[in-house]
Regions:
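Start-transfer (signal-anchor) and selected internal transmembrane alpha helices
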Residues: 1-15
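Transmembrane-helix motifs of polytopic, lipid-linked glycan transferases
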Residues: 70-91, 129, 260-266
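Hydrophobic core segments of transmembrane alpha-helices in multi-pass, intramembrane catalytic enzymes
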Residues: 76, 119-128, 161-169
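Transmembrane catalytic cores of multi-pass membrane glycosyltransferases
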Residues: 16-73, 96, 114, 118, ...
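Transmembrane-helix signature of polytopic, membrane-embedded enzymes
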Residues: 83-106, 125, 138-139
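Membrane-proximal helix-loop-helix units in multi-pass membrane proteins
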Residues: 102, 106-128
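Membrane-interface transmembrane helices that cradle and orient dolichyl/undecaprenyl
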Residues: 127-141, 175-180
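Membrane-interface starts of transmembrane alpha-helices
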Residues: 60-68, 90-93, 136-143, 147
């Protein structure tokens, strides 16, 4: 992409978050951080305090709003550009899709936090960057380990973006008649995630961090109940989006996807590949509910 196109995308991203800047409100945790000055130690986000102190030049946990919101927008656009460049050849699709991460309705809440938004944005970027090196598996493993560890230490939920990108790459391969199931990519991604999570857990234990929240769902009855609770809450979110007028955005996208699959079937693409790509797509959706 040419530099002027990059600039145009970044301008759109900044305009998108401008209403948040103009609203100038403190959102949920912002009020506690402002009045009590507490950080993210109890969340297991051990790098969050470090990064925030660095941004304030050692002056403690202070708000750099609106610069934090604007910088978060830039970082999320960069993340989107990295992903869209991997997935699409058409330049117009690249331009449009590079804004999808930033403009996700669920990301809008994250952008509303004065203190946390930039940490979340850097965490998302860290989860995306390793796939730049996906063709070089040793480098991919090393960068995945480092970047995922950073992501865990900033905002654990963002690590799910790592698997989402991997699934998107598998969808692309299915539709392009490449490997329908890339065992090497899947194995390396899973191993990198497990190793980084183990190291993160050991680090939390070594530093004696008391995890008050932000842990991952456990594989037991309580974990199953939490999954059901998440599914119900997301059903409520989607219903709220749908009745708010977001359906006018959703339905054209759904129709375009269906027409694309029909077109591929008529062109003689293997039905098994198309079905597998749908499974991968559902996996991307589910990953947003399971952190």
């Amino acid at each position: 992409m040419k530099n002027k196109n990059y600039l145009f995308i970044f301008i759109i991203g900044l305009l998108y978050v401008f209403p948040i800047v103009l609203a100038n409100v403190y959102y949920v945790d912002d009020m506690g951080r402002l009045s009590l000055g507490y950080g993210w130690d109890g969340d297991g986000r051990i790098l969050s305090n470090v990064l925030t102190e660095a941004l304030s030049f050692g002056n403690g946990i202070i708000s750099i709003f609106p610069y934090s919101t604007l910088l978060s927008s830039v970082i999320l656009v960069i993340s989107g550009i990295i992903v869209s460049d991997m997935l699409f050849e058409n330049k117009y699709l690249k331009y449009i899709s590079s804004l999808f991460i930033l403009t996700s309705p669920f990301m809008l809440e994250n952008l509303s936090y004065r203190y946390d938004s930039i940490l979340m944005a850097v965490s998302v970027l860290s989860a995306v960057v390793p796939f730049i090196f996906r063709s070089h598996y040793k480098l991919f493993f090393a960068t995945s380990f480092i970047c995922l560890l950073i992501s865990f230490c900033l905002y654990q939920t963002s690590t799910m973006a790592y698997f989402s990108v991997a699934l998107c790459l598998l969808i692309k391969q299915c539709l392009n008649n490449e490997k329908a199931f890339d065992f090497r990519l899947c194995l390396n991604s899973l191993l990198c995630f497990l190793v980084s999570y183990i190291v993160y857990s050991l680090l939390i234990s070594f530093l004696a961090v008391n995890m008050q929240r932000s842990g991952f769902i456990t594989f037991d009855a309580d974990g199953f109940d939490m999954i059901l609770s998440r599914l119900r809450s997301y059903e409520s979110y989607y219903n709220s989006l749908y009745v708010s007028g977001f359906k006018y955005v959703i339905w054209p996208c759904v129709i375009l996807v269906l027409l694309s699959y029909i077109n591929l079937i008529l062109k003689g693409r293997e039905f098994g590949r198309l079905l597998l790509s749908v499974v991968y797509l559902l996996g991307v959706v589910l990953l947003t509910m399971m952190p």
